[in-house]
Amino acid sequence: MLSTGGDLTYLNASTSFETGRWYHVVGTYNGSRMRIYNNGTERGSNTSRRGSIDYSPATFVIGCYLDDNEFYPLEGFISEVRLYNRALSSQQVRNRYNRTRGRHTTRPKPPVVVTNRELSAGPYLAFTSPSEALVRWETAKPMPTRLAYGMTPTLQNRINQQERKRSHEVILPGIEPGAIYHYSVGIEKDGQTQWLEPATGESDFNYSRPDISAIESPYAQDERMRKSSAAAEAILAATGIRKGYALDYGCGEGRLAFALASRTELTVIGVTDDAGEATRARAALRRAGIYGTRVTIQHRPLAKLGHTDNLYNLAVSSELLHNGELPGDRVELLRVLRPSGGVLALDGLPQSGLAKLITGSPLVLGTTTEVSGELLLAKRKPLDGAGEWTHTYGTAAQTANSGDEIVNGSKMALQWFGKPGARGMIDRQGRNPPPLTSNGFLYVQGDNRIWGQDAFNGTILWNYEFPSELRRVNTPRDGSNMCADDSSLFVAMRDRAYRFDGKTGRLLRSFPVISNEAANWGYIANDDGLLFGGSVKPGSEYTKFKGTPYWYDSTGTQDTAKVCSDNLFAIDRQTGRKQW
């Protein structure tokens, strides 16, 4: 592609690009004609440009498409690059190809002989630690399976699973940052291993935090540290909260904050109004090597934190634990606690004393309480009047209305900013499915990947890398492949719909499309305990999005043709039984 001013002109070869093969590719421009050559033969030309090339001041990049917010790398290797200050003739290109042909051997890769329809779920990839990834898939009946994988499409590594089972998972070790991992599932069929369509996962989207459980404590193992460690264990066991943001309200010298951070992926903010305590806490946590990354200590008045509303997944108090007093202001504690499940975990007094801390305060109306051992847990209720956006156009009825009764245009403020960002997304012109939100969860679909996030603070709770079959674009003429309820996300991919737990991402169930012939799952919605679907002909979905031909903003048939279902059905979303 090039420009002589204004828009870019793209030149495509008339031959298809296949991974696992070497190509000699040449592009030339002589001031009036663009040409592209493949293996010594001209495969395309364009005369729409005249004059000198308009060189951009941006970085010159080979091997990918890169701009301010997009990155599409080549799937393969580049052996050699040559740049000329003149346009080569067709004969010169052919001569150059003849001198280099045969220099490279094509690397073998597993043959693709069956499609992913042979699976009852997956495959999909999740990063479980900074150095490991997990690939999951399910088969309709128990069978041994294999996984071929590697950092190139040649899939040079093999993992065999001899056990006959339906649910399969394989750990990929040695994950490196900034790498693309290719993998393919092999299933036993007719006495042979048959390989499925390869998929990829990018470690740029590995958000796993390092395990810091083995770091040496910067605190003496005195009674206060032992009490803090025991309290952290009890709080985590009772709440199950291991990701997000935690507040230590009256944090003392940071012992409880350290104990929580070292056992979880939480980011812990400790606040104290004592300058000496803040200084000692920071010094200790710096010695441990986690200050500023996992724990931060703030010296400020407890009655006026200055933190945004509805932020924290967990709130505790070292001051209460060790001295029997809950400092600060109950109104402020409730204000910063995350709605729909944020937990204030109280410890340090008998249950009767802990209950008095709640009685007569705003915490009574804003939370529900329960006893767990020596703890009193106050869980914040959902926001009264809060809306949700569970389908592409708001609701299953496509009302384009969230039902929110809280928003006031004169009082809006930034809640959070951060990941996932633009890197893993499809460009806006492709019009892929929009984010959904319900009950404090936010679901974002990118290019063959989905993130599950905390809607109140942006924490990435889980994310999956999917095969290219997930992609759905031009939704005004096709439709989204996602919908949500108050606890889960439904995703249509290929011939199935998947239900993932909103908090953990765990696969709860997969639902096969209902059709009398081969079909993909098209329309998807849920309401009143039912999951609705429509079957479409395989391959009828819009999936292409790279380049101006796929901005879907023209009035031609390519952009405006509607994808229609062949049928409509309803399934009980709990049991999976067809209702009609």
Briefly describe each language-model feature range:
Residues 325-342:
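A short glycine-rich, Lys/Arg-flanked "PGG" loop and its adjoining helix->strand segment in the class I
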